Amino acid sequence: MAATRYNPKETEPKWRKRWDEAQAFRAVEAPGKRKYYVLEMFPYPSGRLHMGHVRNYALGDVIARYKRAQDFSVLHPMGWDAFGLPAENAAMERGVDPKAWTYDNIARMRAELKELGLSIDWSREFATCDVEYYGQQQALFLELFERGLVYRKESVVNWDPVDQTVLANEQVVDGKGWRSGAPVEKRKLAQWFLKITQYADQLVDDLKTLDRWPEKVRVMQENWIGRSKGARLRFRFAGQPPAGHEAGVEVYTTRPDTLFGASFVGVAPDHPLAQAVAAANPEAAAFIEKCRHGAVSEAEIETAEKEGFDTGLKVKHPFDPSWELPVWIANFILMDYGTGAIFGCPAHDQRDLDFARKYGLPVKPVVLPPEEAQAEAIVQKLLNEAYTGPGRIINSGFLDGLDVEAAKAAAIARIEEQGDGQGATVYRLRDWGVSRQRAWGCPIPVVHCQACGVVPVRRSDLPLTHPADIEFGKAGNALERHPTWKHTTCPGCGGPATRETDTLDTFVDSSWYFARFANPGAEAPIDKAAADYWLPVDQYIGGVEHAVLHLLYARFITKALADVGMLSVREPFAGLFTQGMVTHETYRKQSGEWVEPKEVEVTAEGKTRRARLVGSGEPVVIGDVEKMSKSKKNTVAPEEIFDVYGVDAARLFVLSDSPPERDAQWSTSGVQGAWRFVNRVWDEFDASEEPVPGTEEAVTGVATDNLRRQHAKTVKAVTEAIEGFRFNSAIAHLYSFLNVLKAERPQGRAGALAHAHRAALRDFALLIAPFTPHLAEECWARIGGQGLVVEAPWPTYDPALTQDAVKVLPVQVNGKRRGEISAPAGAEPAEVEQLVLADPEIKARLEGLTIRKIIVVKDRIVNIVAA
């Protein structure tokens, strides 16, 4: 038979059409059948796929195809996280309608995702900007509102005066808006919040049930929630207290054991006491204003230079009224953590130490490390670094001699006895601010009435949609500017009212979408029966950059919806996998301008690599390997790879290059290697011929036995590797087995070897299907496989064949290794003894000795006791 060349441009579309016609990936609720819900974090419709998308969705597709082959009822859906700022920016910059821009992008990306050959149930597709979706989200909002989980209050926010919107801390760079570059202002605005803090303990405690989540993600969430146990205590003023602060300064601390090491009390710039001081002191007011334009995120504040202002006020130490401490306003204290006030113990807190060194405040050690005998020994160490470890309390009166934990309890007991405070649990987690001053988002379904206050929209009036004639031509909230949309009547009294013009944070959109996929056409927000069948998501896949916010919000909303009876599960994602990024070398001209990889030719002479521009030959600087990004132009367009090598080669490369949790470095040589493998696979199947019927009982021979054993071992190894998310390892086993298939290819069509080879080829087609699905179908058809690979069961194997036929056993004489023998696997001790005594080398070692005992550990070792 003449060899045919594998042509992905013909093959891949053909099989995608066959899958569509067969509705091969439609999810079906099958009571009594095992279900499996695999979901990749849905994408923002930016307009084009990048290689990170290819890797992310290929990972999920491997799992979906594998589980389907194992006879699970599989749900593998796709949607679009479609609201958000980029669409409004496009509207302003290009004069396009954000809705049209978004749906055009969705159409392009949907076509690209379909080209990837993903086993997705497209009948469940939706975008969060679909009225059918965000209308149901508004119903959820009203449900939470009625349950007391939604409220509105004034809050200090980061305000971009150019874009005229609130910015998250992460969007403020060096005190400026990330997009506009304008200096950010601190403003008080009325904002909507969800009471996530009401679930703080559950969110921490339930992390221990998520044993299929990466430990690092669980730790990140635990730290973000920041549950800490300590004490609230009051420092009373020495002398006349400021008006309104007669009770003193309430401080929260996690280290009451270090109270005797206190050298100052600090308050946040936004603390009411700081505001009272600033009202009468222009210098204090100027310092506070400076703080407002400084670092905003906790991480930035942590690394920024510590600065303060001495208020001139003094407070009394709670354990010694004669001991007075100065009160400072400090830029590193957060108003929204604890009480917004601290006592500073420089010896045992690094921030306090940096502050004390700058302003000449005392540093008094009160915890002696276990390895130190004298307090004086640690004073020198405290010049630059605070001691925060365990130890024995010193210089602390009634606490002296106690260890740190015992001292904490004793200090809290004394504080409570004196009536100056009590033990307390505090969280870093704040309620979730969900207001956004943007029109391209989910409208918040409430109105403001002068007579009734805040009134929810009637459910019968949902969905509350955007006005058709909205204008996005300039910065700010287009809903606020609209001449008529915001004017309405109050659902309560029928009087005039105004609509809420803020929209919901897009994290709300992604906090429940996985539940909607259970039945996207349901009349209620969530079809509980369908959700009970499909949830939780068995395997969720996405980047670690979403470890905190998205995943935390989704966990919170799931618990809240369970409490209102909409869900039965309390955790949305049973398993979580965080994949690595796709990276590439960066290239720059001598001028510093970034250059795309396709414009560069790289040559190597020994270990020296040089790069030049294609065409001009201009030298190019080879930079670091970094995450693919448009800004550094080190991206590779997936369609360029698909056009040259086909989809399966691209999938194979991103899955085989490295373990999926690690970054994968893109290389042309790597994808070329994957393409060569695709062709080698096809060549093996193309060369195959149907064995002659009735010849399978012929003598097997060594080659046949070896092939059958390698076949069984490969099925076992690939299965275990997929189960363990070691996809690169699974592919490596397939590479090796292809070599075996080629080496053991029969010379004719008769005999056991021909039948064994044919059976191995059939299973090989099934084993490669999760990774290269189009190639698998073509190979399956080439050897006469019935139906589609996607409908075929996963291969099984005989465990006995995975054991080596022959075992090499070391032989010891009186405890020392003296040789080895080969014995059949599972051989009985008597048979092994005969082999040992017949071995010339062992016989020579035993010459002149009397054998007392031979001990055989089956398939492991032989011990001879001789004298």
UniProtKB/Swiss-Prot annotation:
A motif ('KMSKS' region) lies at residues 627-631. Coiled coil: none annotated. It catalyses: tRNA(Leu) + L-leucine + ATP = L-leucyl-tRNA(Leu) + AMP + diphosphate. PROSITE patterns: AA_TRNA_LIGASE_I. It is found in: Cytoplasm. SUPFAM superfamilies: Anticodon-binding domain of a subclass of class I aminoacyl-tRNA synthetases, Nucleotidylyl transferase, ValRS/IleRS/LeuRS editing domain. Keywords: Aminoacyl-tRNA synthetase, ATP-binding, Cytoplasm, Ligase, Nucleotide-binding, Protein biosynthesis. Signal peptide: none annotated. Its EC number is 6.1.1.4. Its main location: cytoplasm. GO terms for cellular component: cytosol. Transmembrane segments: none annotated. ATP binds at K630. GO terms for biological process: leucyl-tRNA aminoacylation. A motif ('HIGH' region) lies at residues 43-53. One of its GO terms (molecular function) is leucine-tRNA ligase activity. It comes from the Bacteria. PANTHER family: LEUCINE--TRNA LIGASE, MITOCHONDRIAL, LEUCYL-TRNA SYNTHETASE. Belongs to the class-I aminoacyl-tRNA synthetase family. This is Leucine--tRNA ligase. It comes from Phenylobacterium zucineum (strain HLK1).
